[in-house]
Each structure stands twice: as structure tokens, then as C-alpha cells.
Amino acid sequence: MKFSQIELEQAIQSIPYIQNLSALYFSQEQVSFEITFDFEELDKPIDFNIIIDQAYPLKISDSESIRFYLKDDEYKQFSHVMLNNAICFHNQHCITFHKKLQQDFQAIKQWIVKYIINLEKDEHYEHLITENCTYKETYFSFQFTDVDESFSQNEIGIVTNTFLTKSKYKDKDMYHYLVQSFTHNMTQRNCQWSSFYSNKENNLSGIYVFIGKRPSIYDRFSFSNWQEFKSLFNQEMLSEIWKITFSIQQKYIPIFIGYNTKNQDIHWQVAMIDLKDQFFKNTQGIYELCDKKINWVISKNSSYHYFFGRGAFHPNLTDKKVLIIGLGAIGSQVAKTLVRGGCKNITIADYDVKEPENICRSEYNFLPPYTNKTDELAGILWSISPFVELSSIRHLATEYIKFDLPSECLNFLSEQFSEFDYIFDCSTDDDLMYRTGKLSLTSTIFNLSITNHAKALVCGISPNHYRFVKHQFDNILENDTLDLYNPIGCWNPTFKASYNDIAIMVQLSLRTINLMIQENNYQNFTIQYDDNLNLKVERF
């Protein structure tokens, strides 16, 4: 321990609202003792068991290394009390034992005042505290989204699920499923995944029961035994569940318990049930819930607004159709960032193939060493977001546009390009930039180019993007055209810059573009380093 028993006793005795230090056990691995909180505002004292781990006063992972356990179960009704009666709290960093101990005891006193004395409620919604169990020594997870239609009280139906992947979770295997639909009679409510995911095969059926009310104790803890559902599952409901279980030819079935949250969302808690060992029995048409533990598994509302709730681009970008031309160092990073930023409809275009030397500064993987850039990047983008509608083209946007075409073909190309709201031209192809400048487009083009060694980035915006970019490279910026990287063989030389160099420029340019879209104020701009390596965005 980083403190002695005497230091601990003296520190506790110095806290005026702490009494009755007893049952003290002190070792180098762990310390435990009992104390009482007692101060003027309390109707009666509150007793605690306390355990301190040897890392104290430092945290262990993201948890405090001191734990306060309430001795009386009556306090489980209050916020932030866990199933084991421990109070969940997070305190400030402190490396001084005496100061940290006072700080932690003060945090518990503040919790008592706020929740027990003043009976305050947290405004933000919290899910029920649930023990996530294994089924047959395996963990399960189910991802779902909001659906457009509502559910009726006590409605029962079929859930279809798609297997996603298998992973390690803690020390066991975990199987991950995507919820596809909820079907009752002839009404099917579909989760709002992209077509790439919604078109996948359904390979696990389940049952859903919408009860409306949270299946909880103190409105905080999930039921842990099936008999606790007695007041929520009537005979008619159990009869319907019984019939459905026999129509599903599986060894196990997930059962989804649905209820309304105070945010007016619907949450689904999922339990795994074994058809050979049901959670209720049928005795001559009379159904009775068994005294059995509920095997709750992980379920998550991964709707778009939660999935991107921690940060996304402006809706005027994410809700629009986007075309990205050129999927090299710049374009692949642009594509990946836009998808992580919540963009829902993206088309990627590149005629080229990925080779091993492309990987070090792009968003591609080593395996397979050779493949079409559009094909590999599409797979990467789908693995990031289950909401992006993605398509790809290889030649139209990069080659056909350069042909000597009659006016009707140029009009056709203009119509094709104008289907997009925003076009990110990351090809660094001057010929392509010139041709897009000659088309009559309703879309906005952002042409992104980087100088050698990534000392500057230029963003030209239509309709004058060609003129602006050429002027910057030919007359304004310093661009070393001699010290280039020459691949082995007969290839065009390319600029020198690391992944880090390029990413800094790309991320700042996308931040600037997102802001311009939000403000509806489009200006050409450059990004350059000054003499002190500070980046400066200059608009024109």
C-alpha cells in the first residue's frame, strides 16, 4: 500500500461527518473497513463497507480504486447504486493519499445530499442495470435501430437477425447479430440499415414481446428471474410465445423484451432461451413462469443519431449525395473521414488498382496486395458505417470524360455529374480538372491537391476551380518538382509525403469545407505552414 494503517486511521478521524471506524483489515494488497456517514441533514446515519485496492490513490483502468458499499438494500432505489450496493462515482485525479481520501469521502457525501436527502433525479436517460450473461459459455450481442412504426401493448411477433461476425469478448467468444425486422401478422417493421446490411441473409429468428413498461426493480435494475414477469406476461401472451417457439427450428432463441424509454425511444432487452429448457411450462393449457435466471445478453440501439452522436459533419453534408474521384493518398482518406463523419450516400471513382506500395500513406490494407481500389475501399467503408449507401464507378468519371465527345454526350455527362450535390476531386489530374470545369454542373466541386512534401494543400471550388488551382501551383506556392518519388519501372513519379503529413492537411481541409457548407459560404482556400510550423487556412 502507498499509505500506512496509522495514516489511514488519522485521515478518517479528520473527516468530521465520519464515525464508527470498525472491522479494519489492513494488508499490502487490500484494505477493508466499516464506517458511518452522519451529518445534520440526515434523518438517520448511513453505514458503509469500504474496500481500498493497492493502487490507491491512483485509478485502476477507468475505475476508482476505492469502493463504497451500502450495507442496507433500501438504498438501491437511488441513482448510481449498483446491483452489489456499490456507489458508482468518478472523481478527480489526485496523487496525495490524504487529499484523495477526503476528496472521495466528500464525493459520497455529495451523493447522499443530492439523491437521498434532496431526492434529485438525473435528467439524462440511463438504461437499466443489467448483468450481461453468457449462453453456453458464449457471449451474444444484438444491434438494432429505431423503426418507423410504433408497437402495440403486449404485441408479440417474430424478429429476424443476421449474423455479423465472431470475436473475443473478455475471455470468451462473442457472436454478433444485426436485427433486421420485427414482424407481427402481416406488418413488418424494418431496421434502418443501409442496403448492404439489410440485404444480407437472415439466419437467426427470435421472438419479440412489447410490454411498454420497463421490466425493472426500483426502475433501475432489470429483472433477473423469469418469475418477476408474472405481472407483465398474461396467459394469452404466454400461449402465443409457446406457439411461436415451436414454429422456430433452432436450438436457442433470442427473446426481445421491448419498452418505452423516457426519451420516447423503444429499447429492446434481449435474453437467450433454450428450447429444451424453457423459461415457462405448460400444464394442460395453464402456463406458469419458472424460477429461472434470465440470461440477458448485450443489446444496443445503434440508430444513426446514436451511432454518430459523439460527432458528425453538418447535415447539409451528411444528407447529400457525394462523389469522390481519385482514391489514392488524398481520396481514400477523404472517403474514410466522410463515412466516419456520418455521410450516407457516397460514390467512389477510380480506374486504378491498389498495389503494395500504395498502402503506406493510403487507407488500404496489405491483404490482398493487388485489387481494384474501388472494391477494397468499398469493403473498408462498409465495415465502418452500417448506414452508408455506397456505389462505385471505374471509368466514367476518370477516362470517358476526356474523350472528344459530341455535345449530346457532354450533356449526358453533365447530367450524370449533376446528380451529386458535392464532388471531391482528389485525382490530382489536371486534365480531369480542366474537363470538369467545362461541364455545366449544378453540383459543387472541391478539388484537393497537395504540393510535394505536403507543405501546402490547395482547395479549388467550382466553377473556377481549374483557374485557381493552376494559379496557386504555377505562380504562388513553392512546389519542388524535382525531388519526387520514382517507383521501380516505367511509372509516373509522385510527390513525397507520409501518411501523417497528408492526413494533417486532409483533416483540416475537410473541417474547413464542413464549416463552409454549414455557413453556405464557398471560397477557394489554401493551407500552409508558417515558419513556426503553424498551419494557416487562407480563403480567397
What are these regions (language model features)?
Residues 119, 137-282, 415-422, 426-540:
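Glycine-rich phosphate/adenylate-binding loop
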Residues 312-353:
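Glycine-rich adenosine-cofactor-binding loop
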Residues 384-411:
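S-adenosyl-L-methionine
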Residues 351-393:
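Glycine-rich phosphate-binding loop and adjoining beta1-alpha1-beta2 segment
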Residues 266-322:
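N-terminal charged helix/coil linker that caps or initiates catalytic domains
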Residues 64-159:
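Domain-scale recognition of soluble eukaryotic interaction modules
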Residues 12-91, 98-102:
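Compact alpha/beta protein-protein interaction domains typified by the UBC
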